């Protein structure tokens, strides 16, 4: 059996691979059509102009669904491992909410381009990166709370390093972006897709975009740490029928059907 066939480990793998493919394909398309500069564009710039924005939006919507599935499995796993720990239960619920909000933001970013609805796009980015960063932080605390009984210290330290990486990237991005859009480097910068080294604010722009890509990579790394954990879990779905037919008849007791939510043989 291959490693991705064990439990639900294919979920975080598929999430990272699919999201990376969304970025790569839209980037290649945008650069080939000269819609953006090859050197470190904003991630969302790779999906601003047609036809790449169609590809970007469709693929990131699927990525958001994969992300919700991954976050839900993680929630169920932690709940099953620590059903009576009040602190862990509260943190686990908070992580679920934060994760879902981050996925919602990802879908908003994918479907509202910055050149058309800038406010909606920025709101989606704040949800994606802001709530996503908090989700990583909460999951790292959970990893600390669950060691050494549930898992070893190595997982906690890896996730902590990824959270620090994410935090440094976020701070760099927010600082440089705030200065860049302060009004001292021109107006309507959100509409600008091409930057030249002689442009005012070029260095700040490059630092901001580099930090954004770096932050995304920290997200990828964090979800990849779920692979080993997800090898040890599977979910089932139960169908409860209230009658032998679908007509409006009185309910009668029958055997319920139980099958795996996701098969090991996928």
Curated annotation (Swiss-Prot):
Presence of keyword Transmembrane helix: yes
Cell membrane recorded as keyword: yes
Expression by tissue: Expression is down-regulated in ovarian tumors (at protein level). Widely expressed with highest levels in placenta and heart. Expressed in the retina. Not detected in brain or thymus.
Entries under InterPro entries matching the protein: DRAM/TMEM150_Autophagy_Mod, Frag1/DRAM/Sfk1
GO biological process, alphabetically ordered: apoptotic process; autophagy; cell population proliferation; photoreceptor cell maintenance; regulation of autophagy; retina development in camera-type eye; visual perception
Membrane-crossing segments per the record: 8-28, 53-73, 88-108, 118-138, 160-180, 207-227
Superkingdom assignment: Eukaryota
Upregulation: Not induced by p53/TP53 or TP73/p73.
Family matches, as Pfam families: Frag1
Record membrane topology: Multi-pass membrane protein
Subcellular locations according to the entry: Lysosome membrane; Photoreceptor inner segment; Apical cell membrane
GO cellular component entries: apical plasma membrane; cytoplasm; Golgi apparatus; intracellular membrane-bounded organelle; lysosomal membrane; lysosome; photoreceptor inner segment
Keywords from the named record: Apoptosis, Autophagy, Cell membrane, Cone-rod dystrophy, Disease variant, Lysosome, Membrane, Transmembrane, Transmembrane helix
Known disease link: Cone-rod dystrophy 21: A form of cone-rod dystrophy, an inherited retinal dystrophy characterized by retinal pigment deposits visible on fundus examination, predominantly in the macular region, and initial loss of cone photoreceptors followed by rod degeneration. This leads to decreased visual acuity and sensitivity in the central visual field, followed by loss of peripheral vision. Severe loss of vision occurs earlier than in retinitis pigmentosa, due to cone photoreceptors degenerating at a higher rate than rod photoreceptors.
Similarity comment: family membership: Belongs to the DRAM/TMEM150 family.
Function: Plays a role in the initiation of autophagy. In the retina, might be involved in the process of photoreceptor cells renewal and recycling to preserve visual function. Induces apoptotic cell death when coexpressed with DRAM1.
The name this protein goes by in its record: DNA damage-regulated autophagy modulator protein 2
């Amino acid at each position: 059996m291959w490693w991705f066939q064990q439990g639900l480990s294919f979920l975080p793998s598929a999430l990272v691979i699919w999201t990376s493919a969304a970025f790569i394909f839209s980037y290649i398309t945008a650069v080939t059509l000269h819609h953006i500069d090859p050197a470190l564009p904003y991630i969302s710039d790779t999906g601003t102009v047609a036809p790449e924005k169609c590809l970007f939006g469709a693929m990131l919507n699927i990525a958001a669904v994969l992300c919700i599935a991954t976050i839900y499995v993680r929630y169920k796993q932690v709940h099953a491992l620590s059903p009576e720990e009040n602190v862990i239960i509260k943190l686990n619920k908070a992580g679920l909410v934060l994760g879902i909000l981050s996925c919602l933001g990802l879908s908003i970013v994918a479907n509202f381009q910055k050149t058309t609805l800038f406010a909606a796009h920025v709101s989606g980015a704040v949800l994606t990166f802001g709530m996503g960063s908090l989700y990583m932080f909460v999951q790292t605390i959970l990893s600390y709370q669950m060691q050494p009984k549930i898992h070893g210290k190595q997982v906690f330290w890896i996730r902590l390093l990824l959270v620090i990486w994410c935090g440094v990237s976020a701070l760099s991005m927010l600082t440089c972006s705030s200065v860049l859009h302060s009004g001292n480097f021109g107006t309507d910068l959100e509409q600008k897709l091409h930057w030249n080294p002689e442009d005012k604010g070029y260095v700040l722009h490059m630092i901001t975009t580099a930090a954004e890509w770096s932050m995304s990579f920290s997200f990828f790394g964090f979800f990849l740490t779920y692979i080993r954990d997800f090898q040890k879990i599977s979910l089932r779905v139960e169908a409860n029928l209230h009658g032998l037919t679908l007509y409006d008849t009185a309910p009668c007791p029958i055997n319920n059907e139980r099958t795996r939510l996701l098969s090991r043989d996928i």
